[in-house]
Amino acid sequence: MSQIKIILFRGGFAGDLITTLHHMNCFRELTPEGKIEIDSSLLTLQRNRNDMTIEDKDQYLNKHPIISCCDPEFALKHKNQTLMITCSNTSMASYFCKRFYQYHPYMADEISLAEYDTSFAEWSHFWSPKFKRSIDVSDIFTNDNFLSKLDIVLNDNKIKLFNDWKKINKKSFLDHKETSGR
Protein backbone atom coordinates (compact mmCIF):
# COMPACT_ATOMS: atom_id res chain seq x y z
CA MET A 1 0.00 0.00 0.00
CA SER A 2 1.29 3.46 -0.80
CA GLN A 3 2.31 5.95 1.84
CA ILE A 4 -0.22 8.45 3.19
CA LYS A 5 0.60 11.94 1.87
CA ILE A 6 -2.79 13.66 2.22
CA ILE A 7 -4.96 13.91 5.32
CA LEU A 8 -8.41 14.91 4.02
CA PHE A 9 -10.89 16.38 6.48
CA ARG A 10 -13.33 19.16 7.28
CA GLY A 11 -12.27 21.91 9.66
CA GLY A 12 -12.57 21.03 13.33
CA PHE A 13 -12.28 17.26 12.82
CA ALA A 14 -8.74 16.73 14.19
CA GLY A 15 -7.06 16.81 10.79
CA ASP A 16 -3.96 18.59 12.04
CA LEU A 17 -3.66 16.06 14.88
CA ILE A 18 -3.83 13.14 12.45
CA THR A 19 -1.39 14.92 10.10
CA THR A 20 1.07 15.42 12.96
CA LEU A 21 0.78 11.83 14.14
CA HIS A 22 1.76 10.72 10.63
CA HIS A 23 4.69 13.16 10.43
CA MET A 24 5.82 14.67 13.76
CA ASN A 25 8.25 17.09 12.09
CA CYS A 26 5.30 19.27 11.05
CA PHE A 27 4.18 19.80 14.69
CA ARG A 28 4.52 23.32 16.10
CA GLU A 29 2.36 23.40 19.26
CA LEU A 30 -0.66 22.15 21.14
CA THR A 31 -2.53 25.26 22.30
CA PRO A 32 -4.15 25.43 25.75
CA GLU A 33 -7.52 25.23 23.93
CA GLY A 34 -6.55 21.89 22.39
CA LYS A 35 -5.75 22.98 18.83
CA ILE A 36 -2.77 21.45 17.09
CA GLU A 37 -0.69 23.98 15.18
CA ILE A 38 1.37 22.58 12.31
CA ASP A 39 3.90 24.06 9.91
CA SER A 40 1.98 26.75 8.01
CA SER A 41 3.44 25.60 4.69
CA LEU A 42 1.27 22.47 4.99
CA LEU A 43 -1.99 24.43 5.24
CA THR A 44 -2.22 25.69 1.65
CA LEU A 45 -5.01 23.29 0.64
CA GLN A 46 -7.04 23.85 3.80
CA ARG A 47 -8.71 26.80 2.12
CA ASN A 48 -10.31 27.40 -1.24
CA ARG A 49 -7.50 27.58 -3.77
CA ASN A 50 -9.25 28.20 -7.07
CA ASP A 51 -6.19 30.27 -7.98
CA MET A 52 -4.09 27.08 -8.15
CA THR A 53 -4.13 24.70 -11.10
CA ILE A 54 -4.04 20.94 -10.60
CA GLU A 55 -0.39 21.09 -11.66
CA ASP A 56 0.31 23.74 -8.99
CA LYS A 57 -1.35 21.54 -6.38
CA ASP A 58 0.63 18.50 -7.55
CA GLN A 59 3.89 20.47 -7.26
CA TYR A 60 2.85 21.60 -3.78
CA LEU A 61 2.12 18.00 -2.75
CA ASN A 62 5.43 16.78 -4.16
CA LYS A 63 7.35 19.32 -2.03
CA HIS A 64 6.02 17.88 1.26
CA PRO A 65 6.06 14.49 2.96
CA ILE A 66 2.43 15.03 4.02
CA ILE A 67 -0.22 17.75 3.73
CA SER A 68 -3.32 18.72 5.64
CA CYS A 69 -6.12 19.12 3.07
CA CYS A 70 -9.78 20.14 2.78
CA ASP A 71 -9.92 19.77 -1.03
CA PRO A 72 -11.64 16.45 -1.80
CA GLU A 73 -11.41 16.84 -5.58
CA PHE A 74 -7.63 17.13 -5.40
CA ALA A 75 -7.36 14.35 -2.81
CA LEU A 76 -9.42 12.07 -5.05
CA LYS A 77 -6.77 12.44 -7.75
CA HIS A 78 -4.37 10.95 -5.18
CA LYS A 79 -6.85 8.64 -3.46
CA ASN A 80 -4.30 5.87 -2.88
CA GLN A 81 -2.20 8.31 -0.85
CA THR A 82 -5.14 9.89 1.00
CA LEU A 83 -6.54 9.19 4.45
CA MET A 84 -10.02 10.66 4.85
CA ILE A 85 -11.26 11.60 8.31
CA THR A 86 -14.91 10.71 8.88
CA CYS A 87 -17.23 10.83 11.88
CA SER A 88 -20.26 8.54 11.86
CA ASN A 89 -21.58 9.60 15.28
CA THR A 90 -23.82 12.68 15.03
CA SER A 91 -23.05 13.85 18.57
CA MET A 92 -19.32 13.71 17.91
CA ALA A 93 -19.74 15.36 14.49
CA SER A 94 -21.71 18.16 16.13
CA TYR A 95 -18.88 18.62 18.64
CA PHE A 96 -16.22 18.75 15.92
CA CYS A 97 -18.27 21.27 13.93
CA LYS A 98 -18.64 23.46 17.03
CA ARG A 99 -14.91 23.06 17.68
CA PHE A 100 -14.21 24.50 14.22
CA TYR A 101 -16.18 27.64 15.11
CA GLN A 102 -14.33 27.92 18.40
CA TYR A 103 -11.06 28.30 16.49
CA HIS A 104 -12.52 30.23 13.53
CA PRO A 105 -15.37 32.42 14.85
CA TYR A 106 -15.34 34.58 11.70
CA MET A 107 -16.83 31.62 9.82
CA ALA A 108 -20.19 32.34 11.45
CA ASP A 109 -20.48 35.24 8.98
CA GLU A 110 -20.29 32.77 6.06
CA ILE A 111 -22.21 29.72 7.31
CA SER A 112 -24.19 28.98 10.46
CA LEU A 113 -23.13 26.19 12.80
CA ALA A 114 -26.29 24.23 11.91
CA GLU A 115 -25.51 24.61 8.20
CA TYR A 116 -21.91 23.51 8.77
CA ASP A 117 -23.13 20.48 10.69
CA THR A 118 -25.46 19.57 7.81
CA SER A 119 -22.80 20.26 5.19
CA PHE A 120 -20.38 17.93 7.01
CA ALA A 121 -22.93 15.10 6.95
CA GLU A 122 -23.55 15.67 3.23
CA TRP A 123 -19.82 15.97 2.48
CA SER A 124 -19.04 12.79 4.39
CA HIS A 125 -21.90 10.85 2.79
CA PHE A 126 -20.83 11.93 -0.70
CA TRP A 127 -17.03 11.60 -0.41
CA SER A 128 -16.50 8.65 1.97
CA PRO A 129 -17.31 5.91 -0.58
CA LYS A 130 -14.74 7.38 -2.98
CA PHE A 131 -11.76 6.82 -0.66
CA LYS A 132 -10.41 3.39 0.29
CA ARG A 133 -8.60 4.65 3.37
CA SER A 134 -10.48 6.45 6.09
CA ILE A 135 -10.53 6.82 9.82
CA ASP A 136 -13.69 7.39 11.81
CA VAL A 137 -12.97 9.73 14.75
CA SER A 138 -16.28 8.94 16.48
CA ASP A 139 -14.46 6.95 19.17
CA ILE A 140 -11.38 9.14 19.55
CA PHE A 141 -12.19 9.79 23.24
CA THR A 142 -13.47 6.33 24.17
CA ASN A 143 -11.32 3.84 22.27
CA ASP A 144 -8.11 3.14 24.20
CA ASN A 145 -6.72 1.60 21.02
CA PHE A 146 -7.63 4.52 18.74
CA LEU A 147 -4.02 5.13 17.72
CA SER A 148 -3.75 1.59 16.36
CA LYS A 149 -6.42 2.50 13.78
CA LEU A 150 -3.93 4.93 12.22
CA ASP A 151 -1.58 2.14 11.18
CA ILE A 152 1.52 4.21 11.97
CA VAL A 153 4.68 3.57 13.94
CA LEU A 154 4.09 4.94 17.42
CA ASN A 155 6.67 6.41 19.75
CA ASP A 156 6.54 8.13 23.14
CA ASN A 157 6.25 11.62 21.59
CA LYS A 158 3.24 10.66 19.45
CA ILE A 159 1.49 8.90 22.32
CA LYS A 160 2.10 11.83 24.68
CA LEU A 161 0.87 14.39 22.14
CA PHE A 162 -2.26 12.34 21.45
CA ASN A 163 -2.98 11.88 25.17
CA ASP A 164 -2.43 15.59 25.89
CA TRP A 165 -4.72 16.56 22.97
CA LYS A 166 -7.31 14.03 24.09
CA LYS A 167 -7.29 15.27 27.69
CA ILE A 168 -7.98 18.89 26.67
CA ASN A 169 -10.53 18.07 23.97
CA LYS A 170 -12.37 15.37 25.92
CA LYS A 171 -13.20 17.93 28.59
CA SER A 172 -14.61 20.34 25.99
CA PHE A 173 -16.51 17.44 24.37
CA LEU A 174 -18.11 16.50 27.70
CA ASP A 175 -19.07 20.16 28.23
CA HIS A 176 -20.56 20.22 24.70
CA LYS A 177 -22.45 16.98 25.30
CA GLU A 178 -23.89 18.31 28.56
CA THR A 179 -25.05 21.62 27.07
CA SER A 180 -26.26 20.29 23.72
CA GLY A 181 -28.27 17.41 25.13
CA ARG A 182 -26.80 15.01 22.55
Each PLM stretch: what is its role?
Residues 1-64:
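PAPS-dependent sulfotransferase catalytic core
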